[in-house]
Amino acid sequence: MKTVLIAGAGQLGSRHLQGVKTSKHELDIWVYDLSEDSLAVAEERYNQVESDNKTAHFVNSLDLVPAELDVVIVASSSKPRYTIVSQLLSTHSVKYLVLEKFLFPKLSDYSEIDELLKKKGVMTWVNCPRRMWEGYEYIKSLIVPELPVEYTFEGGEWGMCCNTIHFVDIFMALNGAASFEFCIDDLEQEVVDSKRPGYVEIHGTERFTTANGSVLRLTSTTAFDGVSRSIIKNGNNIIEYFEGKGEIVVNGELKNVPVHYQSGLSGILIDELLEKGSCRLANYEQSASYHVAYLSKIAPFINTIKGWTSESCPIT
């Protein structure tokens, strides 16, 4: 029996838990959170999924978790993630680690965690799951690698700070470049409170460019009243992806694809890790480089507007 830990039993963590329960493997599942209320919700959601080869434990201390763990998913918000990972790896042996985004709100955390992961020999990935979506795998098959990718997404209150890294990740997966330049000239000079207490959000347009000529444009505006969709141009192809409806339109021709939720992906992720020793997500080194490039510009932008002097930036 393999042992899995989910650290963080909030909304996302409980969906990870439901997904993990669908794994084909016999699993001993541990769920850790300081909040008894979150643990109760997670247990309720766990019981909504049927499986006859899983056991589950809900605990409020890492001291109660087995010392040797096959897979760990850290699904907390960004602020406590550094502490959770540091504490966990100082007391437990972890084979495979999956971290939720936004990884960390403080730039120095990235190199420190990188050193710790290398020291402990922990294989680590970051959960930007669009790489696992059937729709994006189909789009990837249409991409001509020698030609640039132009990716545009516009929407209303879609949580730009929180979710930009998802789009950056799949954009980089599609265009094949190693790094990007990030332009914030068209962001609105206002910082608003996030839906999640203690975090912030922004509006406007972000622009990312790569050395191979690819461009990603992301726009979030309170005035938007259209249908959100991704528009991807490459060579002769114009691709529209309506993620929420599971519809992809390629040069006017419709293709239906599944709509993916985390509860439908985490079991697949566990199976890939246990059976292959790898998965389709970006590894820590890749994703951390995207995070650092983004945070290096967005943190000073936000902190200047807010009048903060901290080197940290509350995005999650």
Regions found by a protein language model. Name each.
Residues 1-51:
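N-terminal Rossmann-like dinucleotide-binding module
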Residues 26, 71-76, 272-316:
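C-terminal helix-rich "cap/oligomerization" subdomain common to oxidoreductases
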Residues 48-57, 119-122:
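A short helix-to-beta-strand connector/capping loop
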Residues 52-68:
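Short acidic low-complexity segments
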Residues 71-74, 78, 82-131:
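Beta-strand-loop-alpha-helix segment that lines the small-molecule cofactor/substrate pocket
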Residues 134-150:
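Rossmann-like NAD(P)H-binding beta-loop-alpha module
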Residues 151-225, 285-289:
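Rossmann-like dinucleotide-binding domain that binds NAD(P)(H)
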Residues 196-201, 208-273, 278-285:
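NAD(P)-dinucleotide binding in Rossmann-like oxidoreductases
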